[in-house]
UniProtKB/Swiss-Prot annotation:
Similarity annotation: Belongs to the universal ribosomal protein uS2 family.
Coiled-coil segments on the chain, per record: none
Protein name listed in UniProt: Small ribosomal subunit protein uS2
Keyword presence, Ribosomal protein: yes
Keyword field contains Ribonucleoprotein: yes
GO biological process: translation
Native source species: Geobacillus thermodenitrificans (strain NG80-2)
Gene, per the UniProt record: rpsB
Signal peptide: none
Record-linked SUPFAM superfamilies: Ribosomal protein S2
Length: 235
C-alpha cells in the first residue's frame, strides 16, 4: 500500500504550483500542465517522491537518527511544531538564526542560558530578585524560547533536515549542505530542486498541503519508533 494517495493530495491542493511567470525551469520534470497561468504539479511524481522520503526517514529514525523540521513561513509554523512534537523530533518555526547548524556551539550557549533562566524560575530565585530584574529575565526567556524552544533538547547536529519551501529557508539549506546533512524538502514550482536530496514536489503555500506532507514525515518517524519498541519487546 502506498504511503499517500492521489485523492489525499488532490483534496489538500498539493497539485497547485506557482504562477507560470514565477517558476524555476529545473522543476519542469515535476510539472504536469499549466492551467489559468498556474503550473499544476504531477501528483504521480509526488506520490513516488513522498514514498522515497518516507522510506529514508523511517530508516534514519530506525537507526536512532534525529530530524530537524524547518518551516518559518506562516502557513507552515503550526504544522511544523505540532508534527515535530508528535514524533519527538526538533523544529524551528520562527526565524532561522544564522549559524544554527554551522555555529552550533554558539547556539548551544544560548540554549544553556535559556535553561539557566528556567532553573532560576523553578528554584524560586525570581521571588527574591528585584521586580525589574525579573521582568528583564522573563523577557529574555520568552525571546530565547521563541527562537530556540524547538531545539533546546538538540544536543548535537541533526542527521537530516525536513524543510518547507527551500527558497524561504535558503540559509538553513545552505548550512545543511555545507555540513553534508541530507535535506528532505517540500519543493514548489519556483524552487531549485538541485539543492534538495529528497524532493517532494508540492504546493508549499496551502496550510492543508503542508500539514498533510509534514504529517507523513512524522508518521515515518513514528513507524520506525514503533518498530524499535516491538523489536525490544520481542527480545
Amino acid at each position: 500500500m502506498s504511503v499517500i494517495s492521489m485523492k489525499q493530495l488532490l483534496e489538500a491542493g498539493v497539485h497547485f504550483g506557482h504562477q507560470t511567470r514565477r517558476w524555476n525551469p529545473k522543476m519542469k520534470k515535476y510539472i504536469f500542465t499549466e492551467r489559468n497561468g498556474i503550473y499544476i504539479i504531477d501528483l504521480q511524481k509526488t506520490v513516488k517522491k513522498v514514498e522515497e522520503a518516507y522510506n529514508f526517514v523511517r530508516e534514519l529514525a530506525g537507526n536512532g537518527g534525529k530530524i530537524l523540521f524547518v518551516g518559518t513561513k506562516k502557513q507552515a509554523q503550526e504544522s511544523v511544531k505540532e508534527e515535530a512534537e508528535r514524533c519527538g523530533m526538533f523544529y524551528v518555526n520562527q526565524r532561522w538564526l544564522g549559524g544554527t547548524l554551522t555555529n552550533f556551539a554558539t547556539i548551544q550557549k544560548r540554549i544553556k542560558r535559556l535553561r539557566e533562566i528556567e532553573k532560576m524560575e523553578e528554584d524560586g530565585v525570581f521571588d527574591v530578585l528585584p521586580k525589574k530584574e525579573v521582568i528583564g529575565l522573563k523577557k529574555e526567556k520568552e525571546r530565547l524560547e521563541k527562537f530556540l524552544g524547538g531545539i533546546k533538547d538538540m544536543k548535537e547536529l541533526p542527521d537530516a533536515l525536513f524543510v518547507i519551501d527551500p527558497r524561504k529557508e535558503r540559509i538553513a539549506v545552505a548550512e545543511a549542505r555545507k555540513l553534508n546533512i541530507p535535506i528532505i524538502g517540500i519543493v514548489d514550482t519556483n524552487c531549485d530542486p538541485d539543492e534538495i536530496d529528497y524532493v517532494i514536489p508540492a504546493n508549499d503555500d496551502a496550510i492543508r498541503a503542508v500539514k498533510l506532507l509534514t504529517s507523513k514525515i512524522a508518521d515515518a518517524v513514528l513507524e520506525a519508533k514503533q518498530g524499535e519498541e516491538a523489536a525490544v519487546a520481542a527480545e
